[in-house]
Amino acid sequence: MSDDNLAEIRDEKAKKIQHPKGKLTAYERLNLLLDEGSFSEIDQHVTSEENPDGEAVVTGTGTIHGRPVFVFSEDFSVMGGSLGEVVAKKILKVMDHALEARAPIIGIKDSGGARIQEGISSLYGYAQIFKKNVEASGKIPQISVVVGPSAGGAVYSPALTDFIFQVQDIGQLYVTGPAVVKTVTGEEVSYDCLLYTSDAADECSG
């Protein structure tokens, strides 16, 4: 089976999960962002035992108005887009390629955070990504596009990039979700209260 066929099969599965939520798939987002036909996937066959058909991120290179860029698009349809050891390695590799080429790196964010099933390995992966963000600072443009939740450990990397674009009503940046807040503190909060907007700040402060 060709790489294109594998990507198509994976994308069809993702559509069944993403489209009912009003969200696009990882591949659809890349196709909209990049020049038509320019996307070349990196490490498509690098997967974990839990997800042999594809991990929770799609990485690669392409062009925007003819200019080369490197990209990674988190796939919420695979374990909530959570970051495990393999996902971290794929992101780090494409960031290294961007640094070597002196080209922008664009991260499309749609992740529930660390993959708790992998324990400390997922947290170490985040630490390595944050380190790479700092290493790349001032050397290449780093751009985050928040198109879904970017929760827990996933919230910090965008904060270290140069630009953050967030989809209204869908993109969410927060450290801890309402369920965890209620479990730990007993306080009930809405997602709106967790989002950093002036309207939410006024509403939640009373």
Please report, for each region that a protein language model flagged, where it lies by residue:
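Intrinsically disordered, low-complexity segments enriched in small/flexible residues
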Residues: M1-V69, S73-G80
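N-terminal cationic and glycine-rich segments that engage phosphates or anionic surfaces
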Residues: V181
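A structural preference for short, pocket-lining loop segments at secondary-structure junctions
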Residues: T61-D75, K90-I116
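Glycine-rich beta-to-alpha active-site loop
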Residues: A103, K109-Q117, V134-G177
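An acidic, glycine-rich surface segment that forms the CoA-thioester-binding/catalytic face
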Residues: V86-A101, E118-V146
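Residue-level signature of catalytic and energy-coupling elements of molecular machines
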Residues: G22, V71, D110, P158, ...
